UniProtKB/Swiss-Prot annotation:
Keyword Secreted: yes
Record propeptide residues: 1-2
One Gene Ontology molecular-function label: toxin activity
Lineage, broadest ranks: Eukaryota, Metazoa, Spiralia, Lophotrochozoa, Mollusca
GO cellular component: extracellular region
Naturally occurring in which organism (per UniProt): Californiconus californicus (California cone)
Main localization, broad class: secreted
The record's account of how the chain is modified after translation: Contains 2 disulfide bond.
Compartment list: Secreted
Expressing tissues: Expressed by the venom duct.
Comment block on domains: The cysteine framework is XIV (C-C-C-C).
Transmembrane stretches, start-end: none
Name listed for the protein in its UniProt record: Conotoxin Cl14.10
Amino acid sequence: NERHVTCFYVKFGCKHTECITTIVFCWQTASDISSV
């Protein structure tokens, strides 16, 4: 089984290049997903 982790970055409160909060969503994907 190959397991892959995908991450998605969401930034909030950005002024120019400075951001107040960065939230990272990560989830695993597999070739044989039996339950979600």
